[in-house]
């Protein structure tokens, strides 16, 4: 209260009209026999109000009530006296304070004003240095923007090159797929030909088995024919032998005719005639028996030989026809087998060439894929490095922009302070800051810097897809305010569990603030403070972000729920 009165007197420059007063206060305890002035006055008035004869009318109970009333009145008077004494003490204290303040005010009025030229020069030097820093930051910003533009162009060219390589890779994959399909068709045709060749080989094996059977049968027939021929030759030899034997006997008979002796007469018998007749008889018997035997053998042999020859002739004709047919079939099958073998060899050569071409294309594709993967890894690394460099440049640019805005705010603040140097409070703050005294001027300067605005303007566009929406964003980057816009019958509480707020600058997320688990009631605001603006939260609907400053300048703020859906958006565009 004293400081308020002093400030009012200093600002208005008028003297106090309250004059010193003298009071004499006499206090007495409750048990004292002598009372204060007020007590005596009350007692006197009470005593004067009693008329004669009243005491006779009072009973013992009336006297007791009267005494209680008197004690009560005494206590009330004592309380009033104490309150009056405390009030008088306060008045004395305030009068003394007013005198002191009047003396200080008079001393300040009589005090000669000091020269502010050193302070003005110091602030002008600081302003010149600030302008120089701003110019340097502007040039650095231009270089950084040019570098960022070059990096973006390079990233765009690298992306186009990656797209070209990906298109080439797709073309190679399509070509490989078509070649694989063609190879599959060739393999299917080759498999069909192999099956057909296998069936032809099976038929050829069956024909060979049939030919082997026919040849075996021919061999058996030849063996039988050889046997019959040998028997026929043996019979011919036997007949020749018998013929020679007959010739021998005939010659022998002829010789006997030549060596015929003279007839011998025995007892009147002619032995020559006897011998001749007997011998002729024997020869005729032998000859007849031999002829019969020869005829029988010859007939049997001729019949058997004729039958065998007939069977051989018929079998040879049949076998010859079958053999000729089989030979023709074998020749035809050999021709077909030769053609199939040639076709198979041609297909095998073609398949080998296609397989070699496929392997070559596969190796080329593997090499191209490896090169493409290396290029992709390299380009991804380059993109990552460029992105990191771009992020660093953007962060540095954001820092420079924040520093520029801060310098602009400080310059505006200093300009206002210099323009308002007639204000005694402003002069006192500047003097205290110049001589290194930490007082009310420093806090006032700090508050003025934080609450001042730059010479630019900020355009804000808001949009929301639910009950939660942006309410405001502080231009100095100290806080963000969101609110639950529901009310009335549609009012509902919204939980912020898993929600976050993202700040996007130049298409990249520059900062992300994770909201705490809090339920916003309807028509209630929720404030997120920067760490540099507020140390700790003073209410449940406040949160301190783990960021020193939320930043200034053009940016986009987005509220994202736990599922990654955008619930509200605020676009801030700063111009100035």
Curated annotation (Swiss-Prot):
Which spans does this entry mark as compositional bias, Low complexity?
Answer: 28-49
Q: Where in the cell is it found?
A: Cytoplasm
Which InterPro entries does the entry link to? Answer: IF_conserved, IF_rod_dom, Intermed_filament_ifa/ifb, Lamin_tail_dom, Lamin_tail_dom_sf
**What's the protein name?**
Non-neuronal cytoplasmic intermediate filament protein
Q: Which Pfam families match?
A: Filament (PF00038)
Task: Provide the residue span(s) of the region labelled Linker 1.
Answer: 109-122
Protein family membership:
Belongs to the intermediate filament family.
What residue stretches are annotated with the IF rod domain? 73-425
Q: How does this chain assemble?
A: Can form homopolymers.
Tail: annotated span: 426-576
Q: Which organism is it from?
A: Cornu aspersum (Brown garden snail)
Region entry Linker 2: which residue ranges?
261-278
Query: LTD domain: which residues?
Result: 456-574
Q: Where is this region: Disordered?
A: 1-51
Q: Where is this region: Coil 2?
A: 279-425
Q: Name one GO cellular component term.
A: intermediate filament
Q: Where is this region: Head?
A: 2-75
Keywords assigned by UniProt?
Coiled coil, Cytoplasm, Intermediate filament
């Amino acid at each position: 209260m004293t400081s308020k009165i002093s400030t009012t007197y200093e600002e208005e420059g008028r003297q106090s009209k309250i004059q010193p007063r003298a009071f004499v206060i006499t206090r007495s305890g409750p048990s004292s026999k002598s009372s204060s002035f007020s007590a005596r006055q009350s007692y006197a008035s009470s005593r004067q109000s009693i008329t004669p004869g009243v005491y006779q009318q009072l009973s013992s109970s009336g006297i007791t009530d009267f005494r209680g009333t008197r004690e009560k009145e005494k206590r009330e008077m004592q309380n009033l006296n104490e309150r009056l004494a405390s009030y008088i003490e306060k008045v004395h204290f305030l009068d003394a304070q007013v005198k002191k303040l009047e003396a200080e005010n008079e001393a300040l009025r009589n005090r000669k004003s000091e020269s502010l030229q050193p302070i003005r020069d110091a602030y002008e030097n600081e302003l010149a240095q600030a302008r120089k820093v701003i110019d340097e930051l502007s040039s650095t910003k231009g270089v950084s923007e040019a570098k960022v533009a070059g990096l973006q162009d390079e990233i765009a060219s690298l992306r186009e090159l990656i797209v070209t390589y990906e298109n080439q890779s797709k073309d190679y994959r399509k070509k490989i797929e078509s070649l694989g399909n063609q190879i599959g068709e060739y393999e299917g045709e080759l498999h069909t030909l192999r099956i057909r060749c296998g069936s032809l080989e099976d038929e050829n094996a069956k024909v060979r088995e049939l030919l082997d059977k026919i040849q075996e049968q021919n061999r058996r027939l030849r063996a039988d024919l050889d046997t019959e021929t040998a028997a026929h030759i043996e019979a011919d030899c036997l007949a020749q032998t018998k013929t020679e034997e007959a010739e021998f006997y005939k010659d022998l008979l002829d010789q006997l005719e030549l060596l015929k002796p003279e007839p011998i007469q025995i007892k009147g018998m002619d032995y020559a005639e006897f011998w001749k007749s007997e011998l002729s008889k024997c020869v005729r018997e032998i000859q007849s028996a031999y002829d019969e035997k020869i005829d029988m053998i010859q007939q049997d042999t001729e019949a058997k030989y004729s039958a065998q020859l007939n069977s051989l002739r018929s079998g040879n004709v049949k076998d010859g026809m079958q053999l000729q047919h089989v030979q023709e079939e074998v020749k035809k099958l050999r021709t077909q087998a030769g053609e199939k073998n040639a076709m198979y060899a041609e297909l095998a050569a073609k398949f080998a060439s296609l397989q070699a071409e496929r392997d070559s294309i596969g190796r080329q594709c593997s090499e191209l894929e490896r090169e493409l993967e290396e290029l992709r890894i390299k380009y991804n690394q380059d993109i990552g490095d460029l992105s990191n460099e771009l992020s660093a440049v953007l962060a540095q640019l954001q820092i420079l922009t924040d520093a520029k805005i801060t310098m602009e705010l400080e310059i505006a603040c200093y300009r206002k302070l210099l323009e308002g140097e007639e204000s005694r409070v402003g002069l006192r703050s500047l003097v205290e800051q110049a001589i290194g005294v930490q007082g009310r001027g420093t806090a006032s300067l700090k508050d003025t810097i934080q609450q001042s605005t730059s010479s630019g303007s900020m355009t804000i566009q808001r949009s929301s897809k639910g009950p939660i929406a942006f309410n405001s964003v502080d231009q100095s980057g100290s806080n963000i305010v969101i609110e639950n816009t529901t009310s009335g019958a549609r009012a509902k509480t919204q939980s912020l569990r898993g929600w976050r707020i993202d700040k996007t600058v130049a298409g990249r997320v520059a900062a992300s603030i994770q909201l705490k688990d809090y339920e916003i009631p309807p028509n209630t605001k929720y404030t997120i403070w920067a760490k540099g603006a507020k140390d700790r939260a003073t209410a449940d609907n406040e949160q301190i972000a783990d960021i020193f400053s939320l930043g200034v300048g053009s940016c986009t703020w987005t509220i994202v729920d736990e599922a990654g859906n955008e619930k509200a958006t605020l676009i801030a565009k700063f111009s100035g």
